[in-house]
Design a protein with these regions (language model features):
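Dinucleotide-binding Rossmann-like beta1-alpha1 core, especially the glycine-rich loop
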Residues: 1-39
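Glycine-rich nucleotide phosphate-binding loop and flanking beta-alpha elements
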Residues: 7-8, 58, 82, 106-109, ...
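A general structural signal for well-ordered alpha-helical segments in protein cores
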Residues: 8-15, 33, 60-64, 180-184, ...
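Helix-loop-beta segment of a Rossmann-like dinucleotide-binding subdomain
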Residues: 27-70, 164-169, 224
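Short loop/edge segments at beta-strand edges and connector loops
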Residues: 32-33, 75-79, 201-203
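A conserved short coil-to-beta-strand element within the FAD-binding core of flavoproteins
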Residues: 56, 75-90
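Core beta-strand elements of the Rossmann-like FAD/NAD(P) dinucleotide-binding domain
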Residues: 92-98
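Active-site substrate-recognition segment that forms the wall
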Residues: 103-223
Length: 224
């Protein structure tokens, strides 16, 4: 969605250019509010929107738990450090040939003792889960207004609203209801059912960000 509808054709053109690498985007078309309401009855917006038939949504916690169960890995729930021992790596007394550093915002803390200055910082994100009366939300598409707000419908009337992008909060995991209330009020302008919805959960997490917002991946120099 765009505040200025005149920019929708440009957005559609950009999305079309990315379909070759991301065919999951599906078909793209600019549709009216009335057409959206055939898909989402309580949708409320005055202008046209760009609709993508593909894409998907993931409930992060369930996804992570599924991966952990399938991999059968031994999850260590404590702070660890990484040491280089010859051509191998030691973590909490265990030695490995190769280590994948999927540590998110904690990557800087892991590599700093080894002499690396890593351009990764923590960014706080909060979202709130609502329960609406419509039980058919599982077939609704994600609503993405311009800005930080996303409205993500799941099955059986559960709708997630978020997520905040809070800098300079370090690793603070406290819930800020004022921030979530503001997001909820904004979301009501796009999904009317949220006005009478029940709050069922609030979640806080830390995402990793770089100074130029680009993805950060690859082998660590000198540790290949």
């Amino acid at each position: 969605m765009k505040k200025n509808e005149d920019k929708l054709p440009e957005l559609k053109e950009l999305a079309e250019s990315r379909k070759e690498l991301s065919p999951m985007i599906g078909n793209l078309e600019i549709i009216s509010k009335e057409e959206v309401r055939k898909i989402i009855p309580s949708f409320d917006n005055n202008g046209d929107v760009l609709y993508a038939s593909g894409g998907g949504r993931v409930e992060g916690e369930r996804f992570v738990n599924t991966l952990l169960t399938a991999s059968k890995v031994n999850v260590v729930r404590e702070k660890v450090s990484l040491k280089v021992v010859g051509d191998k790596y030691e973590i909490n007394g265990q030695v490995f040939d190769t280590v994948v550093l999927a540590t998110g915002a904690w990557l800087k803390d892991i590599l700093e003792p080894l002499g690396f200055d890593v351009d990764v910082r923590p960014q706080k994100g909060q979202l709130r889960d609502y329960k609406v009366s419509d039980e058919n939300t599982g077939s609704y598409p994600v609503i993405m207004p311009e800005g930080e707000l996303d409205i993500i419908p799941f099955e059986k009337g559960v709708v997630s609203v978020g997520a905040t992008h809070e800098n300079d909060m370090d690793f603070d995991l406290t819930v800020d209801k004022q921030q979530l209330d503001a997001f909820g009020e904004e979301a009501e302008n796009f999904l009317g059912e949220l006005k009478n919805a029940q709050i069922i959960n609030e979640r806080v997490g830390i995402r990793a960000y770089t100074s130029d917002y680009s993805p950060f991946f690859g082998e660590v120099p000198t540790l290949e």
